[in-house]
């Protein structure tokens, strides 16, 4: 739940379809993920501003500097799911500067933005308060409270979900290096 200068926005997070991205968001929001912007134990998003607002497009927040240039001190890969698209207003998605540059910044759409599909990870949608999203102005502040409903949500470990996702990235990189070395060995053997 986002509590903003304008009112409350309730979002449903897609933790089963984008566990790494949701894990990052939840762990930061609850103050459980190490980062360079705030001490561990302090909820990351509390007091941050919506630093970028483009009417009839989206509102963006999550930058610790309030300028759009900040991050938590790390970046992580995109996590696209075929069922999750920017198909209408109220889509919660990661803001980034290109592939693999996700951190803490996010945006919520005012309208459908299909040109962002495959470029920005969708990880939730507004279920209450789209009128508040539409009323947010640049500089409005937020706090984020994670409302865990049901046994699955209560027992879900956000930090573990994010670390698992990051571990898969490391495995993908190592596998790619192994394949490149194999190819290099094959090419070298022919000379």
Task: Label every model-predicted segment.
Residues 1-191:
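Cyclophilin-like peptidyl-prolyl cis-trans isomerases
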């Amino acid at each position: 739940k986002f509590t903003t200068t304008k009112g409350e926005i309730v979002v449903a997070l897609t933790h089963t379809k984008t566990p790494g991205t949701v894990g990052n968001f939840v762990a930061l929001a609850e103050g459980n993920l190490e980062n360079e912007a705030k001490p561990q134990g302090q909820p990351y998003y509390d007091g941050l501003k919506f630093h970028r607002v483009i009417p009839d497009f989206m509102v963006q927040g999550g930058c610790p500097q309030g300028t759009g240039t900040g991050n938590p001190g790390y970046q992580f890969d995109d996590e696209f799911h075929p069922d999750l698209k920017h198909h209408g207003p109220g889509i919660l998605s990661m803001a980034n500067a290109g592939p693999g540059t996700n951190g803490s910044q996010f945006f919520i759409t005012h309208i459908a933005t299909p040109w962002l599909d495959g470029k920005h990870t969708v990880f939730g949608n507004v279920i209450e308060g789209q009128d508040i999203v539409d009323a947010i102005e640049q500089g409005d502040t937020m706090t984020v409270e994670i409302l865990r409903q049901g046994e699955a949500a209560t027992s879900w470990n956000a930090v573990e979900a994010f670390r698992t996702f990051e571990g898969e990235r490391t495995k993908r990189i190592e596998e790619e290096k192994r394949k490149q070395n194999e190819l290099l060995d094959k090419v070298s053997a022919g000379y």
